[in-house]
UniProtKB/Swiss-Prot annotation:
DNA helicase which participates in several chromatin remodeling complexes, including the SWR1 and the INO80 complexes. The SWR1 complex mediates the ATP-dependent exchange of histone H2A for the H2A variant HZT1 leading to transcriptional regulation of selected genes by chromatin remodeling. The INO80 complex remodels chromatin by shifting nucleosomes and is involved in DNA repair. Also involved in pre-rRNA processing. May form heterododecamers with RVB2. Component of the SWR1 chromatin remodeling complex, the INO80 chromatin remodeling complex, and of the R2TP complex. Its main location: nucleus. Its EC number is 3.6.4.12. Keywords: Activator, ATP-binding, Chromatin regulator, DNA damage, DNA repair, Helicase, Hydrolase, Nucleotide-binding, Nucleus, Transcription, Transcription regulation. One of its GO terms (biological process) is box C/D snoRNP assembly. GO terms for molecular function: 3'-5' DNA helicase activity; 5'-3' DNA helicase activity; ATP binding; ATP hydrolysis activity; DNA helicase activity. It is an enzyme of class 3 (hydrolase). This is RuvB-like helicase 1.
């Protein structure tokens, strides 16, 4: 009998985060929200509203506008913002921050806001490069007498033979390129490409014609390049404006020890000046005018926006109306509350009225008992927990009475208790024991108010 053994994977499981189950907004072709889809349960009006926002972003008609997600705690505001980013795809920049992140002792609040604004604006650069690509058939350095005299010799040039499916070419290259070839450890039989303009050399891998060779080192074998050796290749790069700011604010020095030590001695976060950003904007505009680059407005999501103060709101008013601006999504769980920085100004959601006028407000509603039950059931599937119907009802009751988060947080401890007793299915007694061990906010507040205050 032939013995067959299963190989168990040693890879670690990915962590199950709070919004792992969210995969999109869950809309049909007409933009109507399905009751239960893509990890969402309920919130159909908010999902349909954000579906329209996604369509506007894709049509590049939403730049410089703001959305406010207003609703109580645990109603899915952060999940909705995450769903928008997943609907837009990985090519559109999405920068999530919390309102308290911008306060720093080293960088001004307005500078931190502008930095995150520029993180959320992408630049898609399309560049056509002349390259030579093929398998190395010859690698011969040509030597010459040292002009300074002596017995030493210098590399005058290097002859490289490249082969592809459509033919072969022999190139005579500059000695500086020979240094790049040595750094990449290129040998005969390797597949490389050389950029004609910059002279940059990139080793792609070993030709698959040598795949039968036995070597101690694991090689990546690649097929022989198609087409001619000399070809034009379009390369698309996605960067953000903040990446360009940082690259120009901190130009890299040499690779010597002193340059490295100098960079280590300056760990302090420096502020990028407005003058530098204007220079970067001019360069970006010239790229756009030439048709080399395309601006991709992304999404800046600011959670707990009520933590910002009046100076930040004033700055947001101006930043939203600038020529280069992303789509800004704000989230707040406050009703009427005081605006930070102003003692007597009480405003809806903790936001100044002049900024509220510039926002489209999307309301999130509290979940019903049936919706909470469905959400907990979906989370149990994501966390690979088996739960009985009675235990599911008990968790849903806790979620409706206290908060959805409390009901979800009892799920994992209840699973641990069930496994400690040798059961795979979570029962009601596991949920009740977890409820006695872990207090919710309301019970905790009542108990400690009586004892200590």
């Amino acid at each position: 009998m032939v013995q067959i053994n299963e190989i168990k994977s040693n890879s670690r499981d990915t962590r199950t985060a709070a919004h792992t189950h969210i995969r999109g907004l869950g809309l049909n072709e007409m933009g109507v929200a399905k009751p239960i889809d893509a990890g969402f349960v309920g919130q159909t009006e908010a999902r349909e509203a954000l579906g329209l926002v996604v369509d506007l972003i894709r049509a590049s008609k939403m730049s410089g506008r703001g959305i406010l997600l207003a609703g109580g705690p645990g109603t899915g505001k952060t999940a909705l913002a995450l769903a928008v980013s997943q609907e837009l795809g990985p090519k559109v920049p999405f920068c999530p921050i919390v309102g308290s992140e911008i306060f720093s002792a080293e960088v001004k609040k307005t500078a931190a806001l502008m930095e995150n604004f520029r993180r959320a604006i992408g630049l898609r650069i399309k560049e056509t490069k002349d390259i030579y690509e093929g398998e190395v058939t010859e690698l011969t350095p040509e030597e010459a007498e040292d002009p300074l005299g002596g017995y030493g010799k210098t590399i005058r040039s290097v002859v490289v033979g490249l082969k592809s499916y459509r033919g072969t070419k022999q190139l005579r290259l500059d000695p500086k390129i020979y240094e790049s070839i040595q750094k990449e450890r290129v040998a005969v039989g390797d597949v490389i490409y050389i950029e004609a303009n910059t002279g940059a050399v990139k080793r792609v891998g070993r030709s698959d014609a040598y795949a039968t060779e036995f070597d101690l080192e694991t090689e990546e074998y690649v097929p022989l390049p198609k087409g001619e050796v000399h070809k034009k290749k379009e390369i698309v790069q996605d960067v953000t404006l903040h990446d360009l700011d940082v690259a120009n604010a901190r130009p890299q020095g040499g690779q010597d020890v002193m340059s490295m030590m100098g960079s280590l001695m300056k760990p302090k976060k420096t502020e990028i000046t407005d003058k530098l950003r204007e220079e970067v904007n001019k360069k970006v505009q010239s790229y756009i005018d030439q048709g080399v680059a395309e601006l991709v407005p992304g999404v800046l999501f600011i959670d707990e926006v009520n933590m910002l103060d009046v100076e930040c709101f004033t700055y947001l008013n101006r930043a939203l109306e600038s020529t280069i601006s992303p789509i800004v999504i704000l989230a707040s769980n406050r009703g009427m509350c005081r605006v930070r920085g102003v003692d007597d100004d009480v405003s809806p959601h903790g936001i100044t009225t002049d900024l509220l006028d510039r926002l489209l407000i999307v309301r999130t509603l509290p979940y019903s008992l049936d919706e909470i039950k469905t959400i907990i059931q979906k989370r149990a599937v994501v966390e690979q927990q088996q739960i009985s119907e009675d235990a599911l009802d008990a968790l849903a009751q806790h979620g409706a009475r206290t908060s959805l988060r409390y009901g979800l947080q009892l799920l994992s401890p209840a699973g641990v208790l069930a496994k400690s007793e040798g059961r795979d299915v979570v029962e009601v007694k596991d949920v009740e024991e977890c409820e006695s061990l872990f207090l919710d906010a309301t019970r905790s507040k009542g108990r400690f108010t009586d004892k200590f205050l």
